[in-house]
């Protein structure tokens, strides 16, 4: 009986979480003249793809916004990997390092900060560096929130790898600087893919709040900010808006579905043990 109740609760929770997504998909496919139909049918009789074409007509810069969002997400992922790989290797292998535990504690603590808590200091720093209204400002700001968990995941994964392989490479004449690119990185491919997708999705989801304070140039806006700026100036056309938002979710969803095996393996491999 207890198992049944747990399963029932899980099913109801999943349905509750999927309802907004279902409503978004249905609204994006529903003809505009039926959008105000009351009561709104759970399964509309008519569907159309014209809302997607209309979204591009209403928001001429939509392709540019999509490209900007991809650039921001990919940039955050790249910086996260550049920092997390060597940091994770150092923390995972050199356990005699004096400040290893404080650094690991700081990495855990850094995950507790929400982006909205740091918006003001981030803006002040970017302003002083002259990076406001640049791609790099949003990428750098987004990386602040992905590097800690990325480093933690890489450290955890590296601890599951046998150190004998690296020791054998050293004996064969491989320098310490070549071990990371030639030995460690190929063996940590699942963790690298997991970190890349995690950082991309996180960077994608945080673009709006970061770009809202760092970007005012219309050409540099990500999709979420561009849609907000456009639809806040005019009457909301829900069908076209939902179509545009649905398109914005496809890239991270497709990436997750393609690499989900590596993501799960990278996220669950190993644990931090001293």
What are these regions (language model features)?
Residues 3-274:
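A structural signal for multi-pass alpha-helical bundles of membrane permease subunits
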């Amino acid at each position: 009986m207890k198992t049944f109740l747990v399963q029932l609760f899980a099913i109801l929770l999943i349905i509750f979480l999927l309802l907004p997504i279902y409503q978004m998909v249905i609204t994006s496919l529903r003809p505009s003249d039926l959008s105000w139909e009351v009561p709104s049918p759970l399964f509309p009789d008519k569907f159309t793809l014209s809302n997607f074409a209309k979204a591009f007509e209403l928001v001429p810069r939509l392709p540019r916004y999509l490209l900007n969002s991809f650039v921001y997400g990919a940039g955050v992922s790249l910086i996260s990997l550049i920092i997390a790989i060597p940091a994770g290797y150092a923390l995972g292998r050199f356990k005699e390092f004096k400040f290893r535990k404080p650094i690991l504690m700081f990495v855990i603590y850094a995950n507790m900060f929400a982006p909205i808590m740091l918006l003001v200091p981030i803006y002040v720093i970017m302003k002083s560096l002259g990076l406001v209204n640049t791609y790099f400002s949003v990428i750098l700001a987004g990386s602040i929130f992905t590097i800690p968990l990325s480093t933690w995941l890489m450290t955890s994964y590296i601890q599951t790898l046998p150190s004998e392989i690296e020791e054998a490479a050293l004996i064969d004449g491989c320098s310490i600087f070549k071990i990371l690119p030639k030995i460690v990185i190929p063996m940590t491919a699942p963790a690298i893919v997991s970190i890349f997708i995690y950082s991309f999705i996180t960077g994608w989801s945080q673009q709006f709040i970061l770009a809202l304070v760092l970007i005012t140039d219309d050409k540099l806006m990500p999709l979420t900010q561009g849609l907000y700026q456009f639809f806040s100036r005019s009457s909301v056309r829900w069908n076209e808006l939902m179509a545009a938002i649905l398109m914005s979710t496809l890239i991270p969803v497709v990436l997750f579905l393609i690499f989900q095996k590596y993501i799960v393996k990278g996220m669950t491999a190993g644990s931090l043990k001293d």
